[in-house]
């Protein structure tokens, strides 16, 4: 990886603490980018029917479903969540905090009840729509909805 252990290490001539805090949103955005595009690929018919559908077949979706995946799917997901640490220097303890946050966020968005009422952050309602439509192409993102909006795959909840 591209991790570092001394919190006082400076990159790009930036203050080490400024850089440390800057890497948080940068890592989350990169994770979301890798996840979005790899997740879209997982919804191609042959991959969805043979691999990714294993994650989508469980009803109702719950936090436990976030960890239920085909082993190939799990490894591809791991690429999305670890690739940012290969690309940008990240403080080693922060890497672990971000990975734990990613794990818990996955549990949260599979809860299927919480509505953050924020069109820019992926929430359980949004991800529930993704699971409802299965192979169809909606709401692929993990943290944020910008890639879904840019690529035309965002589907908002219907208000009754």
Predicted regions and their residues:
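Alpha-helical transmembrane segments of multi-pass membrane proteins
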Residues: 24-35, 97-106
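Transmembrane alpha-helix/helix-exit interface in multi-pass inner-membrane proteins
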Residues: 1-3, 28-49
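Juxtamembrane helix-loop-helix connectors linking adjacent transmembrane helices
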Residues: 1-31
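Generic detector of bulky aromatic hydrophobic side chains
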Residues: 12, 19, 34, 117, ...
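Hydrophobic alpha-helical transmembrane segments of multi-pass membrane proteins
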Residues: 21, 25, 37-38, 68
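Short, mixed-charge, low-aromatic patches
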Residues: 8-11, 34-38, 82
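Cytosolic/stromal cytosol-facing helical appendages immediately following the last transmembrane segment
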Residues: 42-160
